[in-house]
Amino acid sequence: MAPASSRRMAWLLAVALQCTAFTQAIPARAASALVAWAFTEEGVLKLRTSRNARLEAFFQAASDGRGTRVWIDIPGELRFPRRLEGRGAVREIRLGKPRAGATRLVVEFRPDVDLNPNDLRLRGTAPDRWELVFTGLPTRGLDDFGEGD
């Protein structure tokens, strides 16, 4: 019969192996690649992400009394969804989780703001920096605001 310390070591090893197998079966939820964002008084949305993040941008024209919406999907999961009141032509900015493993930043404009989707381009300025210039956006009343640095 094995001494008590050997049995205890075997038991601890078995528990450790089971815990490892269990944690590998659970899908990992990576933190959002979005590190910081800012909407400038010039009508530019600036994003800072983890290096080489792949972003997708979308446009939805105004309808049913709601303003035009532009949103960007970013890899990784946001911890705390939130809404921020906009300024000037921006009605609101929302950060949320559209699905597991993704973060969405939505810029909703006031209903009277008219934007042409052909004038909008999300471009990378560095491996971890992005800009979306809202050409034609009225800048009166816009102030710099955002989160992070």
Protein language model annotation of sequence segments:
Residues 2-12:
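Bacterial N-terminal signal peptides that target proteins for export
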Residues 10-21:
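Bacterial N-terminal signal peptides
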Residues 22-149:
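Signal-peptide-cleaved, periplasmic/extracellular N-terminal interaction regions immediately downstream
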